[in-house]
Every structure is written in C-alpha cells, then in structure tokens.
Design a protein with these regions (language model features):
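A short SAM/SAH-binding and catalytic strip from SAM-dependent methyltransferases
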Residues: 119-132
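Conserved beta-strand signature within the Rossmann-like core of class I S-adenosyl-L-methionine
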Residues: 146-154
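Conserved Class I S-adenosyl-L-methionine
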Residues: 161-182
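Class I SAM-dependent methyltransferase SAM/SAH-binding core
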Residues: 58-110
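A short acidic, Gly/Pro-enriched loop at the edge of an enzyme's catalytic core
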Residues: 111-120
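Conserved alpha-helix/loop element of class I SAM-dependent methyltransferases that forms part
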Residues: 36-54
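A short glycine-rich, Lys/Arg-flanked "PGG" loop and its adjoining helix->strand segment in the class I
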Residues: 133-145
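N-terminal, positively charged/glycine-rich alpha-helical extensions of SAM-dependent methyltransferases
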Residues: 1-26
Length: 184
C-alpha cells in the first residue's frame, strides 16, 4: 500500500490521487480482498435487481476492474468500457481482458463517446469527486433513456456533503429509485 497518511489525502487533488493509486495498483486487489471489500459484488447485485437487461456499462474510476469482474460473473455478454486516472491500475485492468475500451482520464471530465449506456457505475470512487453537483449532468449524458447510474459513497462524506439534498436537486434529471444501507 502507498506511503500516504490516508485515502482522504487524494480528495480534490487529481495528481495526488493518481500517484496514490499508481503506487497501490499492484497490491490493490489483494488489499481489498484482505479487507473483505464486497461493494463491487453487492453493487452488481443491486444493479441487476433494478435492471435485468444491461448490455452496455460504463465503469467510471474502474481502477483494477473489480466491479467489471463482478459484472462479467453476472452476465458474461455485457460490454464494459472503463475510465480511470491511474495508468498502473489500467494496465492491470487491461490484462484481465474484461473491458472493451479503457480511457485514462478523470471521471469528472466528459469522455468523448459515440454511444450511450444502459448503466454507468462508480464504485468506491465518489470520495475523490471535487464537485459532485457537476458530475451528475455528465453522467446523465452517458445514459440511455431509463438507464441506471449506480454509485457508492462513504457514509461520513454523504452526510458532510449533504448528498440527500444533492440527489433531490437532480430529481428532474434522474429517477432515483434505490438507496441502500452502507456497504463495505
């Protein structure tokens, strides 16, 4: 694991976050397995309970592809594109051969795409979003009509950033239909 005081050091600082995950990439999957981190699997289960016919998914901040692995287990015909700022994480993801396209960039910047997705995922990375209020309109542009955006967020930051109010302010853009209890 990188020699950084905490994951919070990366919040709002893209270069620091990129460096943090580049340094951690080779041990990331093993570390999260040791933490018994189940958010990717639980998020996939929730996603497929909400929408069964997912063909295309965009995985924002895909990291080493843990969410993509769970998607493929659920539906091996799904087509996944991903983006991440960590070049080292993307190298690991590419070796797993799960994603059709991988983009090296921040999820806070719009990706130039020629198509829309049935679902967009952002699992374990909302922590690093500097301006979540600007992210939702970007996400909306990636989704097909009736598409699903699934994300996880830390409980402490959900409260601090008043995410309930933020989500409520986008009710006209999105249909919010599920809020789970905290996941690990």
């Amino acid at each position: 694991m990188p020699k950084t005081k905490s994951l919070l050091n990366g919040i709002g600082n893209q270069k620091e976050t990129e460096r943090y995950y580049d340094d951690w990439a080779t041990n990331y999957d093993e570390t999260l397995k040791n933490w018994n981190y189940k958010a990717p699997k639980k998020a996939v289960d929730i996603l497929f309970n909400l929408k069964k016919n997912i063909i295309f998914n965009l995985d924002l901040a895909c990291g080493t592809g843990l969410f993509g692995e769970e998607l493929i287990k659920k539906n091996n015909m799904i087509i996944i594109d991903g983006c991440d700022i960590s070049s080292q994480s993307l190298k690991i993801t590419k070796k797993k051969n799960l994603y059709r396209n991988l983009f090296r960039q921040s999820f806070e910047k719009k990706i130039k795409l020629n198509h829309k997705y049935d679902s967009v995922s952002m699992i374990g990375s909302m922590t690093y979003c500097k301006k979540p209020n600007l992210l939702f309109p970007i996400i909306f542009n990636y989704l097909k009509k009736n598409g699903i955006f699934i994300f996880t967020h830390r409980v402490d930051l959900w409260i601090k950033q008043d995410f309930d109010s933020l989500i409520h302010s986008y009710n006209k853009l999105f249909k919010f239909n599920y809020k789970s209890r905290p996941l690990n």
